[in-house]
């Protein structure tokens, strides 16, 4: 058999120049590896929703990464059927490029969309290409918990079929947390601990000091306490608890709420704000660049939330942005989850149970009334990021893992 020409192919729906974390994290990894002795390519979707660069070429090389983009049907993701069409459309379009995999020694594939791993499974069978799997979310369990999938239906059976072959044939799995690693070991019995490495996500935000321009940009007064939520408002996020806490505090002029992002709960959040008359809540679309930097800078604390039943199946990427930004964290999460434990044990904020609006309100007021302590929480959050989640830590782990898998 002819020796393979290249080392690593990234297979993911989102990639450079898109600005969502599902694009920036793989691109960060790809360019780091390309600059550290690996030959790297990427097969990804043509950018649309998260792109501000205008038209981009179907093929180009960026920072040593050879990128090929695929056009596919991309519908509005608010409806479940549209999201399914997007998933299968991209996967089918990528499958039509299966010949490309023959050139690579390994493929790294991501869990979004969850049907995508079928392609490297096929590539391994026909070309002997090794593959690695990055588990951003664990399917189908995350879909069960968020009530977007019923056990036994067609999509569920498809996912289970893919999973059976995925975990049997994968060379290595990357979990985002040790909690997720344990979930995989408990529920994917063909996996062993030596085939799973925990590599947390990282962030791009730096700690910025807010200025008058930043406050005025978002309509706040200097000194107001701003509780911010950034990121996805999807099936996995509990937005109700935050909205209810904002409703309780709507007459407290010291506290303002800023909700920024996208997702299939975005319209419900918008409707709740309007129907409840929450003039203390400002909702904005996905921000990036200077707008996002200033929004983070004026935040006094930041909220991370997950619905019940998701322990071990996912990890919110914005949590790491909050830490790197040096912000105290309010976690609306299950009490025995890794997020709750870390927030409490590292003293970087407060964790409250999903649905407990009164405890969330109390935690916010505690931060408002003891701002020096809140600032100290933020300083501890930044220390935690630098010592546990920093970009360089993750990249060194990826480099060592690929060196081992490829016997380099």
Where are the regions that the model predicts?
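A short, well-ordered alpha-helix in the C-terminal region of glycosyltransferases
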Residues: 359, 366, 373-387
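N-terminal subdomain of nucleotide-sugar transferases
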Residues: 1-66
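Membrane-proximal helix-turn-helix segments that form the acceptor-binding/catalytic region
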Residues: 118, 122-127, 153-173
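Carbohydrate-associated surface elements
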Residues: 46, 179, 199-202
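Nucleotide-activated donor-binding/catalytic signature segment of Leloir-type glycosyltransferases, i.e.
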Residues: 260-261, 266-293
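Nucleotide-sugar-dependent
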Residues: 237, 288-295, 300-323, 328-341
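Conserved donor-binding/catalytic core segment of Leloir-type glycosyltransferases
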Residues: 203, 220-237, 243-246, 258
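A short helix/loop element that forms part of the nucleotide-sugar donor recognition site in Leloir-type
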Residues: 55-59, 204, 208-221
